[in-house]
Amino acid sequence: MLQPKRTKFRKQMKGRNRGLALRGSKVSFGDFGLKATGRGRITARQIEAARRAMTRHVKRGGKIWIRVFPDKPITAKPLEVRMGSGKGGVEYWVAQIRPGKVLYEMDGVSEELAREAFALAAAKLPVTTTFVKRSVM
């Protein structure tokens, strides 16, 4: 699963996830993309589950790019532990998703196959998504 090799600090504060995705909002590698229309947090496990679903559907047909990376640590205290005595340990990693962010891209397959594969991937993700094509300028 995806996670940073090393970070400057082990733990982060919760923060707020506001605004729109300024970077990573255009399809830049493949021909088709899966774009987030809602906001939320996607865990490394969810990113991997969606990738597997797409890869299995397209078989050896196309190339898939993952455009998000889980770089925010989420901590949790063990069960039945009293409050206090510091922040819990890092449990998992998430990517914060804003509306407009392209999550995955695909190339080398037909549009119909790409739509089907992205529909399978979208079912694994906690944010609402839409299918987008590369815009030719």
UniProtKB/Swiss-Prot annotation:
InterPro entries: Ribosomal_uL16, Ribosomal_uL16_bact-type, Ribosomal_uL16_CS, Ribosomal_uL16_dom, Ribosomal_uL16_sf. The keyword tRNA-binding applies. Keywords: Ribonucleoprotein, Ribosomal protein, RNA-binding, rRNA-binding, tRNA-binding. GO terms for biological process: translation. One of its GO terms (molecular function) is structural constituent of ribosome. GO terms for cellular component: cytosolic large ribosomal subunit. Belongs to the universal ribosomal protein uL16 family. Part of the 50S ribosomal subunit. NCBIfam families: rplP_bact (TIGR01164). This is Large ribosomal subunit protein uL16. It comes from Cellvibrio japonicus (strain Ueda107) (Pseudomonas fluorescens subsp. cellulosa). The gene is rplP.
